């Protein structure tokens, strides 16, 4: 299973990648929206773990415009334990959410 991790915090990303690879998942890491869009042109991951807040834009918009139409399962990743963001992500169609430690 190939997982695309979209996260701009390298320390957090390294921890997530390590944990997922220990479970035998193949993880591809992208730092921002543009890298993610470029990757999705030629690749289709089995799952996307997507940060809501990225340096070049909003994860919700990326999901709505580029990911949801491809029907790729997505889990939002958020630093904020903000119920509004969680509800918004789930209402948009995300499969789940994770709050950052």
Walk through the language-model features, giving the residues of each.
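N-terminal/domain-start alpha-helical segments
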Residues: 1-101
């Amino acid at each position: 299973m190939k997982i695309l991790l979209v996260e701009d915090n390298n320390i957090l990303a390294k921890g997530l990648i390590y944990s997922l690879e220990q479970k035998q998942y193949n993880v591809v890491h992208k730092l921002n929206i543009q890298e993610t869009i470029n990757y999705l042109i030629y690749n289709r991951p089995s799952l996307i773990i997507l940060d809501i807040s990225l340096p070049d834009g909003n994860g919700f918009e990326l999901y709505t415009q580029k990911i949801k139409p491809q029907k790729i399962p997505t889990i939002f990743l958020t630093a904020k334990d903000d119920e509004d963001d969680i509800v918004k992500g789930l209402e948009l169609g995300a499969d789940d959410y994770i709050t950052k430690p």
